[in-house]
Amino acid sequence: METGKEGTGMLYKSKYKSPLGMITIVCNEKFLLEAGLETQACLLAESAQSISRNEIATVCGTGAGEAGIKGKMTETEDAGRKNALELMKRALNWFDLYFAGKKPDPRMLPLAPRGSEFRQMVWQELLEIPYGKTTTYGAIAGNVARKLHKEKMSAQAVGGAVGHNPVAIIIPCHRVVGSNGSLTGYAGGLDIKYKLLRHEGADMDSFFLPK
């Protein structure tokens, strides 16, 4: 995950139809910046240009992979948009793999979520949680405190950073649960959090939905 390197320039967005609803994906020509379900805010999407899957297929072809895709644009077409189309293809392919149960690695994608240094540290911790596993807000707080050479860190502060994760599912904030097993604090909705963990094969007997 890149920090402080998200750059500027044109923003692009596309939609992915998932089993849990439509996912909005936002990128620029270099990095994936946001991904959110309909119940989650994608703040950059309002100022982003829309690109369709048809355009992606026309320009990038049908193949996708970590190394990128060979484009088919003419020399007169915009290179920045072409790069964004290639990146968006990779993001859509990642979600295809995820919902097919293939356990894709988030590091397949150049991620650059925008946020404070503290939030970036927390989001980096989220990327370390294995597929199908969970951790607690307190455990993340302990890890961040050690990296900052502090005696302790507020689990509530960590919860705020987790809740503001702008790249849902790929940066797996849904894998963070309360210390008592409560499935609490998911911006996409607790029912979505439950379904994501069940999809990944997590031990659901250990969790409960708060009343």
What is each of the regions a protein language model found here?
Residues E2-H149, H199-K211:
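Basic nucleic-acid-binding alpha-helical/helix-turn surface characteristic of O6-alkylguanine DNA
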Residues V162, I170:
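Major-groove DNA-recognition helix of helix-turn-helix-type DNA-binding domains
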Residues C173:
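Short cysteine clusters
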Residues S179-K211:
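…primarily DNA-binding HTH/wHTH and HhH modules…
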Residues V176:
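Catalytic nucleophile loop of clan PA
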Residues A145-G159:
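Short, positively charged loop/turn segments that connect secondary-structure elements
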